[in-house]
Amino acid sequence: MCGIVGYVGHQEAADILLEGLKKLEYRGYDSAGIAVLQGEAIALRREVGKIRNLEREVLANPAAGTLGIGHTRWATHGRPTAYNAHPHTDCSGKLVVVHNGIIENYLELKNELTESGHSFNSETDTEVIAHLIESYNEGDLLLAVQKTYGRLRGTYACVVLDQRDPDRIVGVKAGNPLIAGLGDGEQFLASDVAAILSYTRDIIYLEDGEIIEVTRDAITVYDPDLRPKNKEVSRIDWNLVAAEKAGYEHFMLKEIHEQPATLTNTLGGRFDDRQGKLFLDELNLSAETLAKFERISIVACGTALYSGYVGKYLLEEFARIPVDADFASEFRYRNPVIDDRTLVIVVSQSGETADTLAAMREAKRRGATTLGIINVKDSAIARECDGVFYIHAGPEIGVASTKAYTAMVAAFVLIALHLGQVRGKLSTVQVGEVLAELKTIPSVISRMLEGADHIQDVAQAFAACRDFLFLGRGVNFPTAMEGALKLKEISYIHAEAYAAGEMKHGPIALIDEHMPVVAVATKSATYDKVLSNIQEVKARNGTVIVVATEGDLNITEYADQIIYVPAVSEALSPLVNVVPLQLLAYHIARLRGCDVDQPRNLAKSVTVE
Ligand code: AGP
């Protein structure tokens, strides 16, 4: 995690660094710092908490100068304190480093450096980078960084500034993102384009193992042997307005309401329902190749994985192919049975989640074909996959993923139909029927959102509870999992999800009047079974909040609270049913006074193991 910004130019570096760090706060927000070359010395400012605290400190204690580096932290090694905040210095205090990622061999290096006389001031792994560069620095910062790179193990990106080498900053990318922005007499470095988009749209994406030197007039990228490389400059065509709140109290609420529009973007141009045709050339997989796969493995983390669980149901239903879905962090270490007859689908909003990236690489190493379902364009995973399905959900800022989830599920619907068609399991008419309904889903969700005020009353009634159980079956079991994840991550209420039929095998022991049960009980093949499960809860004095299909009056007999959703087919119901659960979590968290967009201990992009 963590966010990095670097600036070399003619404007006040502190202003640019602070503005950039605010845009990167989604990557971590437990402490932050900047270092600016002020005359011939380095002005270092570090504060615990969000960027606004650092901003106050810089206002009180200005750091004037036109060259600097900055960092927003999500703690891995060492608590979130001012002395653990970046930038970190070497012994001389003349060299500063910011870093995103983990240095796996930092203890070994720290011992070696301590023995040779270096003294450390923090509990971080980052500080070894500063001391290692110091130990190799014989007057050429670039060379010292290259030698240091050769000693570090792990996945990371870092940027270095040395007051004795006052016209440049140097960076290296080794697994975590680092991009450079080209300006006129000023140049930028950052973890993400959003940090520097107000200044430039011309971006260079670094590859792993590349070392970068940034001066006011030029950006030079080197390979690990310090041979200069020719790098392509990409022009960014989206803007930051898409990443602002547009009058909503929180990004999460805005993003929930954006779902009709994002789904329209995800689906747009990808099918013709009247002809029952899909246009998915971007998968980079011919119909013949797709038809030959014997199994599919879906790997992802968190919400992205839950979309994958829905994908498993859909792929098995429509394409009749065996599918497993697993946590990327488990998959990468469990010796999975995959080979060149396996299609591995990796799902990620950010496209840079460390476990998902590593799982994808492992799958490729074993000969599988990889397909990414990704939101962030040109992200690490997107660039390495054999084929990419971009979900086009736009920037998602709220740490709790909402619009990316429904867009990922929509991607799975299209991919499952496509596979069903090329494998001869679905006729053109069948595909056309599902697509015709899919086309209506954005307006179905709009209608659902217009009538969603009642969810605030439900939230009010349950905001003080300490535990929740979520139940669902079939394709809506993942909906229950996603609902529970949303609630726990932003409201800090303990919430767990179970397949409704599994409840009687253990969790039923938890049921009493203090633990509300949220049941997804929309019309489906297992509707009657879910009703029985709800009755089992009621028989034990449980309180039940039911997500039910509009017009289902029967449910009033069983439910304490009902949230109605429009009727849609079972296969597409996860797209609709999750929306009230997102809203329920949002309103409960808001009523509890939680930081909805930046919940404690989390970060939007998890680039560490
Ligand atoms: C979502 O609400 C979570 N914050 C988290 O589970 C997230 O979905 C997960 O970390 C995966 O992120 P990715 O989609 O960017 O790979």
Task: For every predicted segment, state its role.
Residues 1-250, 254, 258-297, 306, ...:
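Conserved short alpha-helical segments that host acidic/polar catalytic motifs at enzyme active sites
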Residues 66, 70-83, 274-287, 311-347, ...:
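Glycine-rich oxoanion-binding loops at beta->alpha junctions
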Residues 259-263, 267-297, 387-516, 589-609:
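Active-site phosphate/pyrophosphate-binding segments
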Residues 291-432, 437-440, 522-559, 584:
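Glycine-rich phosphate-binding loops that contact phosphosugars or nucleotide phosphates
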